[in-house]
Design a protein with these regions (language model features):
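Short aromatic-cysteine micro-motif
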Residues: 1-75, 95-114, 186-187
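Short linear interaction motif-like sites in intrinsically disordered regions of transcription factors
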Residues: 6, 37, 48, 68, ...
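Surface-exposed recognition segments
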Residues: 75-76, 97-99, 116-187
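Short, surface-exposed glycine/acidic/tryptophan-bearing loops
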Residues: 85
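Short, well-ordered turn and helix-capping elements at secondary-structure junctions
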Residues: 92, 105-107, 165-168
Length: 187
């Protein structure tokens, strides 16, 4: 399956509604994905203007800062859970570019999270921009590309699977090496 950033926010709101949680994402003032229309396959200014209610109790994509904190797992390894890539990540060297692998087949990080390095790149909420100490925790207000983190099975160089590595792409692009992970507010 291929997934773009727009697909990810639809999933988050639909899952939130199915579990009687307050959806986080809004497009044109509506949190109901059934009113948003067809998921775009090209750049779409209406969908790009989606907002996120970070106080809602529903599912959402992590911000880039949250993603990195989760990937580090309370440790300071190069990859999520180890300094040895093959211990924790699926990438070109150990997949022969043959596709996504079953989750939880590599070691977890310090928080017990799997596949934060490799397997599929993970969409984050943020628009891509340079990061500084004064950067907002939820990223810049607009841009051309959304943040992707973690590397994938299609990553030719282990560098892209490093926790500190940043990548981005147009939110309408779908590839089978793109995916997402959801987060919720802690109780």
């Amino acid at each position: 399956n291929e997934v773009n950033w727009y697909d990810a926010i639809v999933y988050c709101n639909k899952r939130s509604k199915a579990e009687n949680l307050t959806p986080c994402y809004s497009i044109d003032g509506s949190t109901d994905p059934d009113t948003w229309g067809t998921v775009p396959t090209s750049s779409n200014s209406t969908w790009d203007a989606a907002t996120c209610d970070f106080e809602a109790n529903g599912y959402r994509l992590p911000t880039e800062a949250e993603w990195e904190w989760l990937a580090r797992g309370g440790q300071n390894y190069t990859y999520a859970g180890s300094d040895t890539i093959d211990r924790v990540a699926w990438y070109t060297e150990n997949t022969n570019t043959t596709g996504t692998r079953e989750v939880k087949t590599k070691a977890p990080n310090g928080y017990g999270l799997y596949d934060m390095s490799g397997n599929v790149y993970e969409w984050c909420w943020d628009w891509s921009d340079s990061i500084s100490d004064s950067s907002a925790a939820d990223g810049v207000a607009s841009g051309n590309n959304r943040v992707l983190r973690g590397g994938s099975w299609f990553t030719f160089d282990g560098l892209y699977c490093q926790v500190a590595n940043r990548n981005s792409d147009n939110p309408n692009l779908r590839f089978n090496w793109y995916g997402f992970r959801v987060v919720r507010l802690a109780n």
